[in-house]
Amino acid sequence: VMMQLEDITQNNNITAGYLISNHIYENHQAELDQLSSRGVDPNVQRVMDFSNLNAHMLSVMPSINVLLIKLYNDQGTLVFATSGLPALGEDDTSTALQQALEGTISTELTAPDDAVDRESPLSGKFYAETYLPVYAGHEGQEIVAVLELYLDVSEQIAGFRSVMVIF
């Protein structure tokens, strides 16, 4: 059942992720190009202005059940986060991020965790964490960034649990 739920949530996350990544690429292509590792001073990456993106994402996220968004450049450096996340400029060495930099999409389901800060949007929620490559234009072209998306799947889990009780 968890494998099926993971597949379903990955498909939901992929759909939401592509909508978001297309918006990011279409409306912030210049920033993404500047954030890529091609000859850019890493210190410049930390001062890029994504305030318009942040405002837009925060307004859209609730309608598609997205809890958090992170954006990494093509070297795995965190360059954008919606809220309450690690400092920009930090490198992420997770396997899922490295795979996304190579074009692979991955999703992991996470149960509510008491260790999560109560102020965090993840607190008390089941969520699916998905890493998606952001391409320059269309899939198959150069990967310019990776989008890490946290989708609230609490309602789906509750629905599956109620169906399991019936059977």
Where are the language model's segments positioned?
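Short N-terminal helix-loop-first-beta-strand/juxtamembrane motif that initiates sensory/input modules
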Residues: 19, 58-78, 105
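Extracytoplasmic/periplasmic sensor domains and loops in membrane signaling proteins
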Residues: 46-50, 83-125
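A short, hydrophobic, proline-anchored segment that marks a local hinge/packing element in signaling
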Residues: 129-141
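Extracellular/periplasmic ligand-binding regions of membrane signal-transduction receptors
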Residues: 13-52, 74-79
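Amphipathic alpha-helical regulatory segments at dimerization interfaces
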Residues: 23, 54-63, 96-100
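Helix-start (N-cap) segments at beta->loop->alpha junctions
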Residues: 112-116, 135-136, 148-165
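N-terminal membrane-insertion alpha helix
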Residues: 1-14
